[in-house]
Each structure stands twice: as structure tokens, then as C-alpha cells.
Regions:
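Phosphate-coordination loops involved in phosphoryl transfer and adenosine-cofactor binding
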Residues: 46-51, 158-162, 260
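Short, structured coil segments at secondary-structure junctions
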Residues: 73, 124-126, 184, 202-204, ...
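Positively charged, low-complexity intrinsically disordered leader regions
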Residues: 1-68
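Rossmann-like adenosine-cofactor binding region
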Residues: 201-278
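Adenosine-phosphate binding glycine-rich loop
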Residues: 260-261, 266-316
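Phosphate/diphosphate ligand-binding glycine-rich loop within oxidoreductases
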Residues: 40-151, 271
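Glycine-rich phosphate/diphosphate-binding loop of Rossmann-like nucleotide-binding domains
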Residues: 56-68, 152-225
Length: 316
């Protein structure tokens, strides 16, 4: 993505998105949240436009969030998965993309287990491609909604100590947050087991810790990642009990952070493993608000990439 209007541009990740573009999306998301909170959530901003949610991996939050985002904006939205399409009959990924393109689809929101699948799609077909998570690569809209959630509680992201805790190695959420937060001026700290948080990550402008207490000390934000048990080799991971004891976030550890610390989690949570239930549902937690904010942020992304503008034209 370059600077200026986002109309017609793909959102594949935050690595190549400018701080100005991030600010644009977050500012428009503020207006979209007013729609989300209103009694009449249906607006005609994308009337006549068609969006396909092509999810090759299971999803509850992201797919539902994108579906509601499109429908709230007045678009026609279709959800596709391998089991519910000709992909289940052996149709190739490329042919599926071509079919959707020939039908006149305006945008394809895509989740895929293969890193780089959304980039491939941009070279194969014409519709706007929005990455809803590709392997362990990136998940840009999750990072955008995380930053939006921070800005609702803090005046600015610049200068904040943001701790990302857990399975960094397998986390597309972590990568997008690292790219986005560092561009917005945050001091990003990563923490977790040595098998999941490599020192080489410091090349991205972050600080790496293998002691959770050291990492959380004086933190403004603690973003706890889900332990992706389905992706983890046993050699990389201790027992659940050991992980919870050493790296799980609980009230005892959270006391080391600032008094107004925010606790975040992209979901779904493994309560009692990476995060204690009393922390997940504490006053410091904004986890449920993240879900609501996700709809507003994805509305902003769909509007800006399909229609363009800078938000000043929106009467909300």
C-alpha cells in the first residue's frame, strides 16, 4: 500500500502499510463504530457491492465480524468454505478464485493456512483481496482492531509499553501487531518460552524477554496470545500446567504492570492456560470490547478499499 486513497488496494498485511494509512483506517473506524452502536445498523455505503468471505480455515470471530461489517454497510455478502463449495469436489484454489472473479465480486476476504495465499490471489484475479489470516504470516485486521482498542483507552499509542505474550512463533497476530505498533511509536516487548520467542525477533525493533515478570513490569498494555496447540510440536512446549505456571498471565503477575494496564486477547481463549479467568474478565480486560471493535475496523477497511475517501465525506 502506498499513501493516499486506499481505493482498489489490497490489504495483505501491515508490513507495507504506512503510519498515515493506519491512522486513516483507525479514524474511519471511529465513525463506523457509531453505526455499530446505533439502533439502525444498516447503511447504504456499499449498496450494490459484493463481498465473498473465502475461509479455508475454521473461524468464528473473524468470519462473523467481516460478514456483519459487509452487511452493516449494505453489501451483498457470501460465505464460502472448502466443505460448502466445489473445492470439496477437488476444484483448485485458483479456479475457485477465477470463478468468484468472473461473477463480478468486488472484494474477497480470505483466510488460508498457506502463507502468501492472499498475495497469490492478487496476481490471479481482479477483486480486492483482504487478508483475514494466512498461516503464521499476518492478520492485519486483528492488529488494527487491537490498536483501535488501545486508542479508545489511551490518548496515543506512541511511547506505550506494549507486551505481546505467548506463542510468538506461530502467531500471525503477533507479526501484524509488531509491524503496526512499531510504526505507531509503541515500545513493543515480546515474552514467552525460548522455543517460541527467538532473540532474532529483535531485528524487528522489539525487545525479547523469557521472564514474564520482567516483561510485564510497568506495561501499559498486555496482549496475551492463544497457545496454538494444533500447530505446536511437543518438543517446543512444556505441559499445560508448566506453561500456565511459568508464562500464564494472572493477577499476581499483572500487579507488576501499571495500574491502568489494558489486558487484551485475540481469542479464542484457553482460560486457565495462557490467561487466568479472573484476569480475562477483570476491569482491566478489554477482550469483549475488542470483538465489538473488530466489526467497526473491518467496516472501515471494506469501505476504504472498495469506495475510497478519507472519512470526511461520512456523516456519522
Amino acid at each position: 500500500m502506498g499513501q493516499g486513497s486506499l481505493k482498489g488496494k489490497h490489504l495483505l498485511g501491515l508490513q507495507n502499510v504506512s503510519p498515515e494509512e493506519i491512522k486513516l483506517i483507525l479514524n474511519v473506524a471511529k465513525k463506523m463504530k457509531k453505526i455499530v452502536l446505533s439502533d439502525d445498523k444498516k447503511v447504504p455505503l456499499l449498496k450494490g457491492k459484493s463481498i465473498v468471505n473465502l475461509f479455508m480455515e475454521p473461524s468464528t470471530r473473524t468470519r462473523s465480524s467481516f460478514e456483519l461489517a459487509g452487511k452493516y454497510l449494505g453489501a451483498d455478502v457470501i460465505n464460502l468454505s472448502p466443505s460448502g463449495s466445489s473445492m470439496g469436489k477437488g476444484e483448485s484454489f485458483r479456479d475457485t478464485l477465477l470463478t468468484l472473479s468472473y461473477m463480478g465480486t468486488d472484494a474477497i476476504v480470505m483466510r488460508h493456512s498457506a502463507e502468501g495465499a492472499p498475495l497469490y490471489a492478487t496476481k490471479a484475479v481482479d477483486p480486492i483481496i483482504i487478508n483475514a489470516g494466512d498461516g503464521a504470516h499476518e492478520h492485519p485486521t486483528q492488529a488494527l482492531l487491537d490498536m483501535y482498542s488501545i486508542l479508545e483507552k489511551k490518548e496515543s499509542i506512541e511511547g506505550l509499553k506494549v507486551v505481546i505474550l505467548g506463542d510468538i512463533m506461530h502467531s500471525r497476530v503477533a507479526r501484524s501487531n509488531i509491524y503496526g505498533l512499531t510504526k505507531m511509536g509503541a515500545k513493543v516487548h515480546l515474552a514467552g518460552p525460548r522455543t517460541m520467542v527467538y532473540p532474532e525477533l529483535e531485528k524487528l525493533g522489539v525487545t525479547v524477554h523469557h521472564d514474564i515478570r520482567e516483561a510485564v513490569a510497568d506495561a501499559d498494555v498486555v496482549n496475551v496470545l492463544r497457545i496454538q496447540l494444533e500447530r505446536i510440536h511437543s518438543a517446543l512446549y512444556p505441559t499445560n500446567r508448566e506453561y500456565a505456571r511459568i508464562f500464564g498471565i494472572n493477577n499476581d503477575v499483572l500487579k507488576l504492570a501499571k495500574d491502568d494496564v489494558m489486558v487484551m486477547h485475540p481469542g479464542p481463549m484457553n482460560r486457565g492456560l495462557e490467561i487466568a479467568p479472573d484476569v480475562a474478565y477483570s476491569d482491566q480486560s478489554v477482550i469483549q470490547e475488542q470483538v465489538r471493535n473488530g466489526v467497526a475496523v473491518r467496516m472501515a477497511v471494506l469501505y476504504l478499499t472498495i469506495i475510497g475517501g478519507d472519512g470526511s465525506e461520512l456523516a456519522y
